[in-house]
């Protein structure tokens, strides 16, 4: 399968100039058949953007998708469409998944991952940004994809939510934990 990468250095260079240089993270792990199906459901997509959206009192927006196990929440995010301005696409994803109007602040983490399933290796990128909103009401627009949204705290993401993700035993949740850990470290710097 040939996968087109439209989030490339040409797209990312202006983001680094505007939002700062991110921490680079490499990650590799074996994924299950179910995780492979999730990672390849859109064969043209090879990336996601994850948003650490903070409100005026530094709460973080968290979302839950219908297929998440009970108690699993994570920061929102999604894909940038081919030809779409990256920052506008990230803001669109924030609105769709949380109902929040958010503005990007910092480019926290750029991850290059290899998801291994049987004899296949799937290359994936995740770009993590912090964003700010003055909105306080969470109301997801895309209710087919998002089962719920709520406010959490950074210590909650680093503690109980992290432990729940790891307890699933799933590689893609371990990947999310690595992203969250790197982003939380970058936010403290």
Where on the chain are the PLM-derived regions?
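Acidic, metal-coordinating catalytic segment for phosphate/diphosphate chemistry
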Residues: 2-50
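Short, mixed-charge, low-aromatic patches
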Residues: 5-10, 43-51, 84-88, 114-117, ...
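Short N-terminal helix-initiation segments at or just after the protein's N-terminus
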Residues: 21-24, 67-77, 92-96
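N-terminal strand-loop-strand
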Residues: 29-75, 102, 106
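A short, hydrophobic secondary-structure junction motif
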Residues: 51-52, 129-136, 182-189
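Unchanged
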Residues: 80-103, 111-166
């Amino acid at each position: 399968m040939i996968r087109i990468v439209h989030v490339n250095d040409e797209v990312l260079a202006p983001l680094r100039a505007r939002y700062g240089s991110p921490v680079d993270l490499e990650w590799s792990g074996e994924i299950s058949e179910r995780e492979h199906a999730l990672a390849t459901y859109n064969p043209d997509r090879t990336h996601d953007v994850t948003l650490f959206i903070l409100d005026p009192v530094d709460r973080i927006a968290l979302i839950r998708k219908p297929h998440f196990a009970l108690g699993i929440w994570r920061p929102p995010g999604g894909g940038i469409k081919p030809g779409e301005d990256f920052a506008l696409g990230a803001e669109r994803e924030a609105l769709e998944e949380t109902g929040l109007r958010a503005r990007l602040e910092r480019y926290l983490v750029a991850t290059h991952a290899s998801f291994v399933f049987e004899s296949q290796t799937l290359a994936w990128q995740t770009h993590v940004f912090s964003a700010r909103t003055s909105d306080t009401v969470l109301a997801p627009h895309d209710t087919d994809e998002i089962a719920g949204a709520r406010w959490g705290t950074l210590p909650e993401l680093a503690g109980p939510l992290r432990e729940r993700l790891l307890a699933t035993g799933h590689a893609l949740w371990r990947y999310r934990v690595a992203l969250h850990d790197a982003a939380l470290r970058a936010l403290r710097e």
